[in-house]
Every structure is written in C-alpha cells, then in structure tokens.
UniProtKB/Swiss-Prot annotation:
Pathway: Protein modification; peptidyl-diphthamide biosynthesis. NCBIfam families: diphth2_R, DPH2. InterPro entries: DHP2 (IPR010014), DPH1/DPH2 (IPR016435), DPH1/DPH2_1 (IPR042263), DPH1/DPH2_3 (IPR042265). It comes from the Eukaryota. Keywords: Iron, Iron-sulfur, Metal-binding. The keyword ATP-binding does not apply. This is 2-(3-amino-3-carboxypropyl)histidine synthase subunit 2. GO terms for biological process: protein histidyl modification to diphthamide. GO terms for cellular component: 2-(3-amino-3-carboxypropyl)histidine synthase complex. Gene3D superfamilies: Diphthamide synthesis DPH1/DPH2 domain 1, Diphthamide synthesis DPH1/DPH2 domain 3. The keyword Plastid does not apply. Its cofactor is [4Fe-4S] cluster. [4Fe-4S] cluster binds at residues 89, 110, 341.
Length: 498
C-alpha cells in the first residue's frame, strides 16, 4: 500500500492535532532522548550547527530537547521533520539547506548508511518487560539446544543486554545480534552476542544494520529467528530476506509472543509475478525514492545500464512523495522500479496502475545470468559491484554484435525477444543512421516509445502541413473561466434587445 512508503496526504489534512504541554517530565526527557550523550557528541566534535530530526510522534518534545541542547553546548539547533520518503531515513538534504555540521536522528530508523554529514542516532528507550520477554522466549523454544537468532527493533536496543544475560546461561546456542552503526547512543554498550564476534570470518552476518556471528559450518537457514518489536516493515523485511527461517516475535506493547504465520511463499509469488511483468515491459520508469542513502546514484546508473542491455527504454522520475495520481500521469511507462531504503522498497503496487518493483526484481528480469533461487534482496547496496549479491554482465567479445534469445511470457503466453547488445551498439544507441543487417537481410530497429505511440487510438493533433489555410492571429478572451470579460457585455446587450 502507498502508506507503507509515505503518509496519505488526505489523512494528514484531516488529522486532529492536539497540543501537549507536558509530554514527558524533565527527568524522563533527559533519559529518553539521551541528552547528555548527545551534548557530548556535539562538543567533542566542535559542531556549531546541529540538525535535530524528529518523527511526527516525537515533535511535541522537540522544542524542549532543542533548548536543552543549545543551553548545554551553545550550538545552534534546527528542528527537522520527516522526509518525503519516510521517518526511518535521514534527511541530509534538509540539513544541508540550513548549513548544519551534523544530524541527530531521533526515533526508529532503517539504519541505512549516509555519507554526507556526521550522524548520531538516538533511538529512545521504549518500555519493555525483559522478564516477560524471556518467559515468552522459553515458551516458544522449550528445547534448550535450539539454534536461535535474536533480532530487535532499534527502539528496544537498551534492553538487549539484560535479555542476553537471562537467556545465554540457559540457551548455549542463542545468538543475539547487535546494532552496527557509525554512531548511536547506547548501542556501543551492547555486547556482541552469546557467541564471540571478534573474529573476522565468513560466519559474521551483517543485515539491515544488525550484525551477528553464526557457528562454523552453519548458515542462517539452520536457525530460528526471534524478533522483538511490533509487526511492521522491519519484521517483514527480515522475513522476506530469510524466507526459509521460522520466525517468532514478542510484542512489548502487549507483552505477548507468537509464531509468525505470514504466508511468505504467497508474498514471494506476488513478487515473482511482478518480475514477469518486468520481463514483458518495454519502457521502465526509475523512481528515486531516497536522496540520503549512500550509493543511490550508483544503483540508478547500474539500473540504466541493465535496462539498456536488455533492450528496454528507461526514464528517471524524481517526484518526492509517491502516490497513485502522480504515477498515473505517465501511461507510456510499463513498469516502475523503486530505488529506496530497504524498509520502503517493498511497496505494494496493487493500488497503482503499473507495477512497482525493486532493483533486485528488475535485475532478475533483465539479467539472464541472475537466476531465481528463492533468495530475496531488498538492500540495493548488495547488488553493487563488491556486494554479496552482485551479478554482472559478461564482457562482450569484439566479434559479437548482438545475442538474441527468445522467451515465453508466463502472463500473456506470447513470445518475447531478449537481446543483449554489444558495447559498440550501446554507445551508439543515440543514432540509428546506420544499422546492422542479420543473415536474412532484414533490418530490425525497434523503438519502445514509437511502438506505444503507434498503438494508441489517439496520437495527438495532426499538423496537416500545407492542407490548412494560414490565418492571422486574433485576440483571445480575457478573464477567468467562470466569467470572461466579453461574456458580461454580451449578456447585457442581449437583455437590452429583449
């Protein structure tokens, strides 16, 4: 749904906003927002301008937190709201507009890396009953020898140290993840896990800002996963990425644990259907869904190259908040690919007129060397050269001109041709003055935009050059549509005649 990516504009306009003068007591405010640690971060780095980014639910405390930081550090603070793409992402663009030296991001986060400005995460400390969480864990996993990975929402990172103490003495094979960020208040105090993380080997797993180490000879699929937090995008992201694992969760809001019964196979079938739609597409729209995640420009260029190699046409769209009416304006686009942070990449496109896929799904559709194995990637940085899931195109030989393959669409049942052009043809794609002939002496030069135009029932106004008489320009009407200036005079003259 569109709400998974951005808030509904109608809901924002109709929302009732109440003023809260005493949102948190002063003592709780310093503890919740970890003001001493934030001030220490600012003063130790000699920052003079600081951008404070608050999600909507924490904005009532923004003024008090800002005043406290300015009083302790003498630095100038600027309060920022959510980005156009979601509250989990850091708004580096707005911070640069005010000339900030660093950013302090409050609340939940997708932990996507940023490169422009120094960044400090303050996740806050949501309440959680650690003993009840441990009790639910023991009920869900009665076998003390179970291999389990513990993941958590970042807002509960403050309690993971206590939970690890309660579990590791009883469950020797439990692996507790830790946050892996450049700067985060409190995260540095959390120990690695029950299993030592100091060794740098292949057993260390890094995913969505979490890091843990599994035992030698095992994979993540050999473990069950216990997640601490509410049902949401973070949990869905993990379940899609590790779709062969059995998930359980503990909701601190209700203090209840359960085995997750989300039909991941059904969700993967929907995504595979979107991949088939991408294979059938001729014109692809690249949606820019982030301006702050590191390497987003690199993945856009890689997508352009991949789409071009597959014989498709691509256009890039940077339109801020994405909604159905905006995307419906471009009928020529067959499918969209969204470049966003991992938590906002899985956009349910059922409401849109055209499907919206992820960069991983687009590469599956365009790169025949990447095969569907059940592995699912939502972090586009893993698709870049050097990433764990990078699959490049082979370098074309000098004698090769074009390699054509024929495929059958699983949706329409029609034949479709997939061509991988040589580098020379790619660099000369801007001109079609000279084209190569194949062995049957037929010239083939397809254009997706021209094909779409030829298939439309109405192709625009026909110029009919030389067939229409040339006339002088005449004075048009003045005013607004509800009442032009000449209309009033005509009505008055008509009444006089009557």
């Amino acid at each position: 749904m569109t709400d998974a990516f951005s808030s509904s504009s109608e809901a924002v306009l109709q929302r009732s906003v109440t003023s809260t003068h005493s949102f948190h007591p002063s003592g709780d405010l310093l503890l919740l927002y970890q003001t001493p640690e934030t001030c220490r971060f600012i003063t130790s780095n000699h920052f003079k301008k600081v951008a404070l980014q608050f999600p909507d639910e924490l904005l009532p405390d923004a003024v008090r937190v800002s005043a406290e930081i300015e009083d302790k550090t003498k630095a100038k603070t600027y309060i920022l709201g959510d980005t156009s793409y979601g509250s989990c992402c850091v708004d580096e663009v707005a911070a640069e507009h005010v000339g900030a030296d660093c950013i302090v991001h409050y609340g939940s986060s997708c932990l996507s890396p940023c490169r422009r400005l120094p960044l400090l995460y303050v996740f806050g400390k949501r309440p959680i009953d650690v003993h009840q969480c441990a009790s639910s864990f023991k009920e869900l996993y009665p076998n003390l020898q179970s291999h389990i990975i513990v993941l958590f929402d970042v807002t509960y990172s403050h309690a993971i140290d206590d939970l690890r103490t309660l579990l590791c003495d009883v469950y020797p094979n439990v692996v507790v993840s830790r946050l892996k960020t450049d700067h985060s208040c409190g995260a540095e105090l959390i120990q690695d896990s029950c299993v030592d993380l100091q060794s740098n080997d292949d057993g260390v797993i890094f995913k969505f800002g979490r890091q843990f180490r599994i035992k030698e000879g095992q994979t993540v699929n050999d473990y069950s996963i216990f997640y601490i937090g509410q049902e949401g995008l973070t949990l869905t992201n993990f379940m899609m990425s590790w779709n062969n694992c059995v998930f359980s969760s503990f909701n601190p809001e209700t203090s209840t644990g359960r085995v997750e019964s989300v039909q991941i196979n059904k969700a993967l079938m929907k995504r595979y259907y979107a991949i088939e739609r991408a294979k059938d597409a001729s014109v692809v729209g690249i949606l820019v869904g982030t301006l702050g995640v590191a390497n987003y420009l690199i993945i856009i260029e890689q997508l352009k190259d991949t789409i071009q190699r597959a014989g498709k046409k691509s256009y890039m769209f940077a339109m801020g908040k994405i909604n159905v009416p905006k995307l419906a304006n471009f009928l020529e686009i067959d499918i969209y690919v969204l470049v966003a942070c991992p938590e906002n990449s899985l956009l349910d496109s059922s409401e849109f007129y055209r499907p919206v896929v992820t960069p991983f799904e687009m590469e599956l559709a365009c790169n025949k060397h990447r095969e569907w194995t059940g592995e699912y990637v939502t972090d586009f940085r893993e698709l870049l050269p050097g990433g764990s899931s990078h699959v490049g195109f082979p370098e074309p030989s000098q004698s090769a001109t074009e390699e054509e393959t024929t495929d059958v669409s699983l949706i329409t049942g029609a034949l479709r041709s997939c061509s991988t052009n040589s580098s020379e043809m790619m660099h000369n794609s801007e001109t079609s003055s000279l084209v190569l002939r194949n062995q049957t002496l037929t010239v083939a030069n397809t254009n997706a935009a021209a094909s779409f135009l030829a298939g439309r029932s109405w192709q625009g106004l026909e110029p009919k050059l030389g067939q229409t008489p040339v006339v002088k320009a005449v004075k048009g009407q003045r005013g607004i549509a509800i009442a032009y200036e000449e209309e009033g005079n005509e009505d008055a003259s008509t009444q006089q005649k009557l």
